[in-house]
């Protein structure tokens, strides 16, 4: 049994009997942190829990995906997409990498939903109050004005109540927002499957400020490939690089992120910044033998 599955089963064991019985077939060795709208409705009926109570009860399962070798502080988040599906996320840290590369649980859950094709988030449930960094990150979303935030033992509140007089994309003349469906039509002639997958990700990236349209693909020792696209933020610092989104993709797919063996990064040369140097250094900290292909379009 993997460490992740052990954590999931430990979390399951602490749930009310009716909920545990209904969840057990779902939380199997193939579970990748997604609960469909239909599954959620079935769990709610079986457990007789309210929508809020059920989401809060599921948080320990989301936190089981946490990778926190520095803080040993496990945070879970559950983002509900506009489809009604729920996406787990958890904080991620890396030894020997500067703390700015850390992924917060809210960023993880939202990235997970983005990877799965969601175009907006209706609500997010978190086991600890969102930090200012995450409040600003969420304010980039297409649904920032209507997004609701649920914490344990508190009433649900809007993001705008957590971030009064907020600064966001509209203040910089940007319409749309993070998770808006995009296709930038970047093109690259290559025989590399990894570069092609990174290009697909770059074409979905959100980079209205630096115009650094960028995406990455990671190949793991298992042979599986995971991708990520750049999620830029109006406040700049809360931006989430493509590598971090790809690492969320891998982690929520039950991969050990230390087993990345090769990567490919694609960027638009017209961008005002580059992810190349920080991507190289972070990958090398995960695996000193990793190889990185790079294309500047």
Swiss-Prot record:
Q: Which cofactor does it need?
A: Zn(2+)
The main enzyme category here is hydrolase
User: Active site annotated at which positions?
Assistant: 106
Q: Which E.C. number(s) belong to this protein? A: 3.5.4.5
Q: Which Pfam families match?
A: dCMP_cyt_deam_1, dCMP_cyt_deam_2
Single Gene Ontology MF annotation: identical protein binding
Reaction equations catalysed: cytidine + H2O + H(+) = uridine + NH4(+); 2'-deoxycytidine + H2O + H(+) = 2'-deoxyuridine + NH4(+)
Q: Give the record's GO CC terms.
A: cytosol
Q: How is the cofactor bound?
A: Binds 1 zinc ion.
List the keywords (alphabetical): Hydrolase, Metal-binding, Zinc
Q: Name one GO biological process term.
A: cytidine deamination
Positions bound to substrate = 91-93
Looking up InterPro entries in the UniProt record yields: APOBEC/CMP_deaminase_Zn-bd, CMP_dCMP_dom, Cyd/dCyd_deaminase_Zn-bd, Cyt/Deoxycyt_deaminase, Cyt_deam_dimer, Cytidine_deaminase-like, Cytidine_deaminase_bacteria
Q: Which residues form a coiled coil?
A: none
Taxonomically, which superkingdom?
Answer: Bacteria
Q: How does it assemble?
A: Homodimer.
| Family to which this protein belongs | Belongs to the cytidine and deoxycytidylate deaminase family.
Q: What does this protein do?
A: This enzyme scavenges exogenous and endogenous cytidine and 2'-deoxycytidine for UMP synthesis.
Q: By what name is this protein known?
A: Cytidine deaminase
Q: Which gene encodes it?
A: cdd
